[in-house]
Amino acid sequence: IILTPYFIPKDKTIWKALVDARKRGVHVKILFSPHSDALLVKEAAYPYIRKALTQGIEVYGYKNGVLHGKVFLIDKKVLMVGTVNFDSRSFHLNEEMNCYIQDPIYISKIKPVIDEDLQNSKRVTSSDVNQLSIKEKMKEKVAKIFE
């Protein structure tokens, strides 16, 4: 599972890794924040959410305000927590730092928090991102320019 306020995986290597994992049968979940402290971030995520859904990747939108955590949990064995958003700026431009944790006791304490965040989220469907209002479609086009 990947928790990120911004889901804009423009980087082809990162996108390919997600898709390849899914093709290998890995259950990939993305939890992002549709409510953001940054302009047009939700709209910039729409094309990637559409692509993720077509690849069988589950996408969830956090309902209880702004989700600002950056967490990756892999097979309940590796936890990554830090400052990296799931976007090209974090991967290539900003100075970011993550901590990799493999301590099963620590992970077992964090997992329920992640599960609670998922429970406080709505699973995104194709119709959610394909039946946008005219206003949202326009915002998506503008977001694409600045991505």
Predicted feature residues:
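PLD/PLD-like phosphodiesterase catalytic module centered on the HKD motif
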Residues: 6-147
